[in-house]
Design a protein with these regions (language model features):
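Feature marks short, highly hydrophobic, charge-poor N-terminal signal-anchor/signal peptide-like helices
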Residues: 1-7
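Metalloprotease/metallohydrolase-associated module, dominated by Zn2+-dependent proteases
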Residues: 8-29, 38-139, 159-216
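Helix-boundary capping/turn motifs
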Residues: 140-145
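Active-site recognition of the HExxH zinc-binding catalytic motif
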Residues: 146-158
């Protein structure tokens, strides 16, 4: 993707986001403020859902940091023969650790374009939390974790944009580690499709044997 096209796309997204009429409020849960839509009676429950998903992500990120020896000295890394200093896995994990920022998470309204999306590798993340038909019904926590890992993979995919093949390989790598860490239960959506904010989900790269693995 050319820089000019990328700039145009960012401008379009920002114009959509900041030109919308959505009103949000900040609700404090577990010492952190969450930006959720204010025109629902269960806004506090939405903030709690975000907090619980974030807590899973924090455990997952700590697992990745430890497994791939991020921010360790060269000497410490050298003592672990299975994970040398410069590997593709460490670059992916480092990009995710550097870019993940819950302070710029915002609830996104169901039925809007994109359902959930990330701007500029983590500058902002808009996350749909509600059923499209019954908007007082919050999404399933496991589905939300899958979506959060999807958005996290956009951050981790440090040298790519969009949903090209490389993104799906990175997403598979992230899912494999999330399952290994115990923070995400693998769900085969090809066998058990689910609705997410009006989007029909019928694919999980974790189960795609034709998709290349990034060695863990």
């Amino acid at each position: 993707m050319s820089l000019g096209l990328l700039i145009v796309l960012v401008i379009i997204v920002l114009a959509y986001v900041y030109g919308s009429t959505d009103h949000r409020e900040t609700i404090r849960v577990a010492g952190r403020d969450w930006n959720v839509l204010s025109d629902y009676d269960n806004a506090a429950a939405a903030a709690l859902l975000l907090e619980r998903t974030h807590a899973k992500m924090i455990r997952f990120l700590a697992y990745l940091k430890d497994k791939y020896h991020v921010n360790e000295t060269d000497e410490e890394i050298a003592d672990c023969a299975t994970h040398p200093h410069d590997t593709e896995q460490r670059r992916i994990v480092t990009a995710l650790l550097d870019g993940y920022n819950p302070d710029v998470f915002y609830e996104n309204r169901p039925g809007t374009n994109g359902t959930s999306y990330t701007i500029n590798k983590g500058s902002a993340m808009y996350i749909c939390l509600r059923n499209k038909i019954n908007q007082n019904k919050l999404v399933d926590p496991d589905m939300l974790m899958y979506v959060m890992l999807h958005e996290a993979s956009h951050i981790a995919n440090y040298n790519g944009w969009g949903h090209e093949k490389r993104f799906w390989e990175v997403f598979k790598f992230i899912l494999q580690n999330a399952v290994e860490s115990g923070t995400y239960p693998p769900i085969d959506y090809s066998k058990r499709p689910e609705d997410y904010c009006g989007l029909h989900v019928n694919y999980n790269p974790y189960f795609d044997g034709a998709l290349a693995n990034i060695d863990m």
